Amino acid sequence: MSGKFAGGKSYRARIAATGAGSLLALAVLAGCSTAPGPVAQPEPTVVAAEHTGQFLAELGLEGLDAKQAIDRLDRLPQEQRPENFTAQVQPTKLVLTDASGRTANLPLPEGQYYLSAAPYVDQTHSCHFHSLTTCLGQLQGAQVQVKAINADTGEVLVDKGMETFDNGFIGLWVPRGITLDLEFKYQGKTARTTASTAGQTSATCLTELQLV
């Protein structure tokens, strides 16, 4: 993660996996990621399907599907965030990776897309795929008015007040394969953007949302 928020009551600093070199490296590699590029990445050790349940149990996620795991992890208080694995939301799957490099991919529900947004006042960081275990936004526990509209049909999908999680993000389950017009209002300031939920490389993490 490149974002650092010093001072202020809205940010409580945290360093993932302090004193554990392998876990720190894991957080750096799979944290709030930038857009995927052409550089080849090391091949992870993919957990066999028949062992996925055991792997999830080791991570404290026994019996959970992708949606349940995402909803649980994104809402955790910062001090309860796991330090022995990372969880990255990609357009069609949740990627879980432990400190040894073992990885399991849990498919997202058919036709659904998880979009994480972190509106900010004056501090942010770059992000493309949302990390449920390492990403931090500036505003924690903030009341934000959120509107999400299907740009293709004009249908209003979300129009309500929401509280940012302890990680500073708002989580939205929206339809896959559409374009969204998004608006966030906080203390008289507004941030707007357009996002796509189509394709295999679309962003699941929105952090360029300055409130003005």
Model-assigned labels for residue ranges:
Residues 27-31:
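C-terminal motif of bacterial Sec signal peptides marking the signal peptidase cleavage site
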Residues 3-20:
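Bacterial N-terminal signal peptides that target proteins for export
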Residues 107-157:
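Mid-length scaffold segments of soluble, non-membrane domains
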Residues 104-108, 113-120, 198-212:
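Extracellular beta-sheet/turn segments enriched in Thr/Pro/Gly and aliphatic residues
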Residues 33-36:
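Bacterial signal peptide processing site
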Residues 153-167:
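Short, acidic Ser/Thr/Gly-rich low-complexity loop/linker segments typical of extracellular
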Residues 163-172, 182:
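Glycine-centered loop-to-beta-strand initiation motif
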Residues 178-187:
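A short, solvent-exposed beta-strand micro-motif common in secreted/extracellular proteins
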